[in-house]
Amino acid sequence: MIQLRQLNPFANIPSILTAEEIIEFAHNRSTRLSMKSSLRMKRVERTRIREISRLQEFVKQVKIKMNDAVEQFPSIDRLHPFYLELAEILVGNDKIKQSLGAVNNCKPLIDDITDKHIQAIKLSEDHRQMTRSRRAAKGRISSILRRTAENLDFIIEAKKKLSRLPGIAPNIPSIVCAGFPNVGKSTLVRNVSTAEPEIAYYPFTTRRVIIGHLRVGNQSVQIVDTPGILDRPMAERNAIELQAITALKYLANVIIFMIDPSEACGWTFDQQVTLLREVQKMFPVNPILIALNKIDITPPDQLEKARAKFPDVYEIIAVEGTGLENLLKDAVDEVDLKPMKESVDDYLASLPRDKS
């Protein structure tokens, strides 16, 4: 079974080392390198082979660890818009590109230093000078790494933040549940999911999103509860929170807005309608279905008020599953089910994998 976390393009980036950690790692690997040489070989030739091999091993390990930072980091320009928007909010996409480019630009400098010092070792007939050349090369390469240390540190921090994002399959239709706290969103997600929903971090909220999967007919669907996101008036949000919310427009093929007409959730019916209007303004293109939950405990006069306000509303009892089948079927019908560009397997294959 696919773990949702795997669908986050940043979740499987290998461990990235700091500049000092790369230097230490490469040094330890190169000094442990064992050499085999003929006893009949002259000392100067044995030294030449040893120093060249140690330098090459040092450079090899440095490049491997640099590639973990650069080549294994997802291409920003190829990200799904949902992740692209969140990456911009959390770390800044231009800053990521700049830091990755700065680290990558170190590699030709390292190659140039390596070639020059290997050539010096090959031409030398003094075993002490060979050792000095190898140490000089390591010193210059270490200096290059230290000069780009801030870029490596930024990439490490970016990976830490972005790897926590929820795993969303961009090629599977997504239903996002909205509404005030305690209206029954998480109950709906848990009751319709075919497996235990996964819980994931979402930026600028103190609570976690709940992601479930289900099948409606022959269609696989993601359903997402958004506690702390679409559950309070927009006037209470700062600019960055609003930007994080608008990222959902790239995720939500359809929104189910749940209203508790019984007001047992702690919010009046009118307050819930006001929030609905705000969500409709923020997501003018996304289809929004309105569901009245807890109709079994709603006083008749309050239920009639809600019905009069929303003639085409869905009436459900999420805790019992009543009315959910029609709601979900119609939600999926609202989704544009054009052929997806890639299958889940293709998408997973495009993500970086830790080879360690």
Residue ranges and their predicted role:
Residues 167-170, 192-222, 226-246, 269, ...:
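Switch I (effector-binding) loop of TRAFAC-class P-loop GTPase G-domains
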Residues 183-184, 323:
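Conserved glycine(s) of the Walker
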Residues 285-289, 296-354:
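Canonical P-loop GTPase G-domain recognition
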